[in-house]
Amino acid sequence: SVPDCGTGPGLIIGQEIFGVNKTMRQIADYFAEEGYVVLVPDMFWRLTERVELAYNEKDFKTAFGYFGKFDLDLAIEDISISMDKLKSLDECTGSVGYMGFCLGGKLAYLTASKLEPEVAISFYGVGIPEMLDQGNNVTCPMIFHCPELDEWMPPEGVKALRNAFESRDDIEIYDYPGADH
């Protein structure tokens, strides 16, 4: 998605386990309206192309199957390629951030620790507490959005996240009481 003004900073949107579905496209369009050049890469392309699942029990099982086969290292390579591609576009003014949801939220954390985005934002990222050893490698400002009732990031995980980054002024963690994944 490209803003009406034609140019802007780059933003990569990291998909949930449901693929590049209507919700991810709507988020991309919203941020394009706000002035960003947005790319939503298909992170499941190695498993099957164009995964677009709904938020129902049947599709959740399918999504979880893809998630179980997902290779994080290859995903980071794909994100690196996506960042380079976005930066090369005439429409992109050069800086690129990464914002992800669920699986994409986990990838936001890994992108911040392994690549060099301008900023990274994680919405209900899964499995981050198990990867806190990567925290010293985060080189950009980062925001974590953590729902209180998220079974994939329980309160003890959020506490560990806070403890890991308590000395970092450039990392913010927001809680959402009563909210679920």
Whereabouts are the PLM-identified features?
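N-terminal cap/leader regions of alpha/beta-hydrolase-fold enzymes
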Residues: S1-H181
